Amino acid sequence: MAEETEKKYITNEDLKKHNKSGDLWIAIQGKVYNVSDWIKTHPGGDTVILNLVGQDVTDAFIAFHPGTAWHHLDHLFTGYHIRDFQVSEVSRDYRRMAAEFRKLGLFENKGHVTLYTLAFVAAMFLGVLYGVLACTSVFAHQIAAALLGLLWIQSAYIGHDSGHYVIMSNKSYNRFAQLLSGNCLTGISIAWWKWTHNAHHLACNSLDYDPDLQHIPVFAVSTKFFSSLTSRFYDRKLTFDPVARFLVSYQHFTYYPVMCFGRINLFIQTFLLLFSKREVPDRALNFAGILVFWTWFPLLVSCLPNWPERFFFVFTSFTVTALQHIQFTLNHFAADVYVGPPTGSDWFEKQAAGTIDISCRSYMDWFFGGLQFQLEHHLFPRLPRCHLRKVSPVVQELCKKHNLPYRSMSWFEANVLTINTLKTAAYQARDVANPVVKNLVWEALNTHG
């Protein structure tokens, strides 16, 4: 009987071997779990688990899951424990902090941010309709366009929050809020956002695993991209050819203009995913939501009196959303980067190294949607944004205690740092001594004689 109840052990080296399809193991709090079959139904998708299999994932599990998720692990338990199980001082303090926040009820107390934002979005939508349908001046139409851009920004924050935690009274209403704020109002699939955003959170600033840094041929935040890295997220080579070299060489000049048209790329990414062979949760609902957007938006634009006004309406609305695209890049482009998969053993350290906070007064929190506290958000993605400011000093102290970076700077300083990062890579891209992969189309267009 004693033998039956005796614990079974494997080492971390043994655990690493279970990282292939059909044999996927992870460890949480020293207990080993087999997620080979369960990965197909994981609410957060398979990518995040595949990036961490064969290792301890305790910190990531704590960050992304509510307390109710722990009981789901029971039926996945292999019976094995990790013999050489150790917890670093950083992880110990992080877990203690997460437990304290949970005791204080911070994860459950969501405040009224969602209600206020939804009301604000509804008011702006009515304002846009009034400006287009009831006004005749060009100026009023441009104000409506700018208002629409601001609406898209705020609506994206609702979609972002609802993807991390339940912002409504139940999960069904939460899903409705996702589809409304993402697909119907902005034309960007919430399924696409969750697919890429979860991967970004887990592999923060990994050049080959984080999709938010993979913008070849337009941008390269590091010279490591010059060796044509393979994207482990998109499963394709990020070829640094003559076209990429040319574009990257001037990226510090093209950065802001490209941001003005960032939405077009998101539209394209949405359709690429929805028409792909990938398993897409709620594909039909995502299609329906996108159809709603591409019904009301062109119809609204068509109500303007002539084509020049229609063009400038679209241009202005897209340009306003550049503020949000810039914010996304300010949080990461100039932070530390690395090549390789994320690791569970230094999860906190990687989040601290890969993020930059934007300092602002509290009355501007609505504008940034909580993302100005980027490190706090990455450490506690389920924490409602109304609490991010109050936990910021605690996070800062923890970083100071363990000699980890805590970068917080003004909007202007972050812009300067980002441009300098792009400029540094741009100048190195111009070095003809660095070999590049030949682009046959480019070569043909530039052949003389």
UniProtKB/Swiss-Prot annotation:
Entry keyword set: Electron transport, Endoplasmic reticulum, Heme, Iron, Lipid metabolism, Membrane, Metal-binding, Oxidoreductase, Sphingolipid metabolism, Transmembrane, Transmembrane helix, Transport
Localisation: Endoplasmic reticulum membrane
Histidine box-2, short sequence motif: residues: 197-201
UniProt-recorded name of the protein: Delta(8)-fatty-acid desaturase 1
EC number: 1.14.19.29
Chain ranges of the Cytochrome b5 heme-binding domain: 7-91
Consequences of knocking out this gene: No visible phenotype under normal growth conditions, but mutant plants have strongly reduced levels of unsaturated LCB sphingolipids in all organs and show enhanced sensitivity to prolonged low-temperature exposure.
Residue ranges of coiled coil: none
Main subcellular location: endoplasmic reticulum
